[in-house]
């Protein structure tokens, strides 16, 4: 509820599928190649060419449908969506209108610790358009890169079930993690491989839904939050002023922090959909549908609940780990060894590892860290072989070099001194050299103990076992 108005949000999420070739031709499906280098007569829309559907696209879409609990339409067709734009050489896009590959479904998300179910209207397959290039060096004209033409997409259309920008963000993050878990989309928003259109309306409680506006050019999840919040405020201001919200398509300008009108919102009839005459009806055998369902891994929302219930993680930590394929695998591999509590691993994963990745821009795959090495490091710390400070030094090496924990400890001389006689000798020397602190402690100044332990650690060059060192000093102080 915002200023007495209920907010209604629906999202249309486009995900580029990471197949090797495009959806209707053999051109390479790869980002960042030379302009117009991955094109052919089919994806350029030349007269007389005939498309051939990439079977892998159907498989990927069905897997996403299973992940979102969708009905799978084993018999469906493809349609032409007619509109003119410079980056669409055929002047139509091959999509699905009446019967999508995946029908009704849902996804459960956690918002502030509470479970919310968001309905899925449909998932359909379609081809991407090209990309317009704008630059001052083009002397007042725009050029077209058709490399993206024919890149396979799935469009995931939600029900208008979200009631806040935060819910929308969590929904998008959940979709992203599922796509990555399935391995069907890399979800690199900076490359446009996942993007969304946002539909927003507001209404007074008890009244019918208001007129919605669609917002495009939303290129990050944080931009989606800002865009939704702005659009809600804009629509409320229009209604409070006695105006009428128009059904229109708007463009989000993240730099200006505002949405800008583009055109009146089209209805399906404006696109003059009709069946694609150059492609056969899609018929998927039930056996294949069942096989694809079996290939679905444990999904992040399921992992979150398992991490909370089985390992005692809080929701924030569980969500952070579960939504990253690589971090979740590292954590699960460590816990599978069943040696130490989860906290021993999450301290390193959510602390030093994430800090390193944020500072360097690297992913876990870019490091040399393995579950075996992390478990060995935790074992060394738990056995008091090295201190926590020494552990940080070892961890830093594990990130950069393929070495054993034991070798790093030996090379850097990080092994703690735990021999009682050696520690007692250090304690005797420190106590003799710090008579005032000894008297202070005996006189009731307990903070003097910390100073004495610190001096012992300094004398041992950090190698003394601090726990044992403290015990020995206490025994000697009486």
Predicted stretch roles:
Residues 1-298, 315, 337-341, 351:
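Basic, nucleic-acid-interacting segments
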Residues 446-478:
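Short, amphipathic C-terminal "tail helix"
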Residues 3, 312, 336-345, 385-386, ...:
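Structural motif
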Residues 364-375, 379, 388-458:
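Strongly charged, low-complexity linkers/loops
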Residues 288-295, 302, 332-340, 374-386:
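Extended, non-catalytic structural segments that build the interaction scaffolds
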